[in-house]
Amino acid sequence: MKITKLEKKKRLYLMELDNGDKCYITEDTIVRFMLSRDKVISEEELKEIQDFAQFSYGKNLALYHLSFKARTEKEVREYLKKYDIDENIVSQVIANLKEDKWINDGQYAYAIINTNQLSGDKGPYVLTQKLAQKGISKSTIEENLKEFDFSEVAQRVANKLLKKYEGKLPARALQDKIIQNLTNKGFSYSDAKIAFDDLDSQVEQETTQELIFKELDKQYTKYARKYEGYELKQRLTQVLARKGYDFSDIASALREYL
């Protein structure tokens, strides 16, 4: 077979043969096989050219995708599949990129966890989930998590939560709120409890009394219209308990208030 045409089409070249066959190839393919118009090639050579062209095209696509930010093997593989590249070629591209250090799931996991240590707010459980969704193996995730101590992250998050809720919630409700937020962010209950216990500032009793009397003013206006005496006291006790106040603080406040 003889090459009758080599014409550039955007990022690819159209190669036509004298038997009517056509295929798109990359510039790397032209250089590798020293292709030119009127060159004669065999069926076997054509197959090699087509395979390499798809490999070269796939690698170029992958490198373009990786040029914006680091990606995991799964992300690159899924990206290449969108372009209908043969699965075997995709695997070859991935292997080549891993060999050249363009793809490294271990380094990717380490970078994500390290960034979280410096400025993030996620615990190990949430990070594990996020990295697993990116296709990183459980063993790789666990290996990298072992390199980090999450107590400082938990403490940083606890301090931010304290500033947000202090003066707005009673002591028990504040503790529950902070610990719940920490566990939702991926910290274990024990780590969340330690972070809360290590907080420098705690809600003072005076603040709790101010909050409970403020809440009593609001709830008394609501319930005094329907109840009185013992029933009113019970209703107020229940609503204050649901808001996180200790029963001893509630009883003390009601003695003064009613």
From Swiss-Prot:
GO terms for cellular component: cytoplasm. The keyword Cytoplasm applies. It comes from the Bacteria. Transmembrane segments: none annotated. It holds the Pfam family RecX_HTH3. It is found in: Cytoplasm. One of its GO terms (biological process) is regulation of DNA repair. Keywords: Cytoplasm. Belongs to the RecX family. Modulates RecA activity. HAMAP family: RecX. This is Regulatory protein RecX. It comes from Streptococcus pneumoniae (strain 70585). The gene is recX.
